[in-house]
Amino acid sequence: MSVDIIPVETSRDLRRFIDLPWRIYDRTRYPQWVPPLRIAVRDALNTKSNPFYRTADRQLFLALRNGKPVGRIAAIENRGHNEFHRDRVGFFGFFECENDQAAANALFAAAETWLRGRNRDTIRGPMNPSTNHECGLLIGGFGAHPMIMTTWNPPYYPDLLEAAGFTKAKDLLAYHFDVSADPPSRLPERYRALAERARVGKSLKFRDLNLKDFANEVERCWEIYNSAWEKNWGFFPMSHESFLHEAQVLKYIVNPRLAFIAEVDGEPAGCMIIVPDFHHAFKTIGNGRLLPTGLFRLLSAKRQIRSGRLMILGAKEEYRRHGIFALFVHELERRYNEYGWTELEASWILEDNDRLNRPMRDMGAREYRRWRIYDRQTLAPEAS
């Protein structure tokens, strides 16, 4: 039977696009998979309400065999990225597929054709929908369940991409801290000493994120984020509107003691945000729907969370060479032990970011998961 590729143009097709993972991920075969919240997937795809699409566009495709969906993909034109990097890279994301090379090839071809029509010369991904959101294809660490806002896929997915001609662009790492280890403290003495020296002569303090002043706190974190990540591979600045949109979700799940800002002489210098791993709660929902019982299950499971993801750790450029990383880790160690949590993941960290990778390893963390961003060259028409 041949594969048919159709563009997603109707509400019915969109439902089939969103529902597809439940067809692919057998819960017995893939117990690590965490069903996403359907409302979150719908938001990430919504070109009318999601501010990301003010400077981006996308086209969704479904792969059908005998009329039944066997794969999906989004082709994404990210003009914000292109303007910042002065390149013609196009993107793909939200990729899911049965172990069917013909279907995968057809999906990539459809996305590439759409991007080529928009003068893109490379197709890169997966991005869901950008590096400021969920991204990367898991290539190592399949045995662990994914932390919140990270991706998981079956082990055959990398084979589908590589057989289709995709090659490595960059790897992203996750480190695991066993906070329950004896002794629980993992900060080497030299980092403690560096942290103490960094404090000397500086009016530096850490304070909890103030959820009652949420709009202004988002403004501060947005400025730090765009400054701290500016030179990272694949980064492009988030608009204030997009940052606020994404932060609205975090407002309801972060613990202010584990989302804190560093101030120097009263000015925001950096921030660290650890997100409780609600994926444990998402698993109890199963079907990805908050109603009629999902919300209750989510709130009930919240009390049992004992792990988190270090999602944001950044400082403005003028403070990066003054021991502020050691100060953040010293403060994190003190706060994390208050709650009796047992696990912490730090992700994503670029494979060549030695400024973070080396201290992670020094502190006894182990690399336990790795994602890959893939590229494939395409033949875009010359710009007119």
Predicted regions span which residues?
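Generic start-of-chain signal for non-secretory N-termini
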Residues: 1-34, 39, 382
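Acyltransferase donor/substrate-recognition loop-hinge adjacent to the catalytic core
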Residues: 3, 151-234
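Acyl-donor binding region in acyl/amide transferases
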Residues: 83-165, 285-363
